Amino acid sequence: MKHVLTLLALASVFAVSNQALAYDGQNCKEPGNCWENKPGYPEKIAGSKYDPKHDPVELNKQEESIKAMDARNAKRIANAKSSGNFVFDVK
């Protein structure tokens, strides 16, 4: 009787664990595309309360800083080629 109860308990644990492994909590539209919006989240973001409404000036700050960084790096490389040693702070 003890063996039967043990086997029954193991079988039930195995059955429950297989069901738990099979369900991942997502409804995928296709493999790799499993994002689901939360209830109440709009299909279209523009014009909703979730729209970030970025300022174009703020968006261009990163582009300007990257251009300035590239210009500084070009000066450093030109100085390194002409002098033979690398100097970080080149005016």
UniProtKB/Swiss-Prot annotation:
Entries under InterPro entries matching the protein: Meth_DH_bsu, Meth_DH_bsu_sf
Coiled coil: none
Signal peptide: 1-22
Record flagged with keyword Ubl conjugation: no
Intrachain disulfide bonds: 28-34
Membrane topology: Peripheral membrane protein
GO CC, alphabetical: plasma membrane
Pfam families in the cross-refs: MDH
Catalytic activity: 2 Fe(III)-[cytochrome cL] + a primary alcohol = 2 Fe(II)-[cytochrome cL] + an aldehyde + 2 H(+)
Biological-process GO terms, alphabetical: methanol oxidation
Function: Catalyzes the oxidation of primary alcohols including methanol.
Subunit field text: Heterotetramer composed of 2 alpha and 2 beta subunits.
The protein's name: Methanol dehydrogenase [cytochrome c] subunit 2
Species of origin: Methylophilus methylotrophus (Bacterium W3A1)
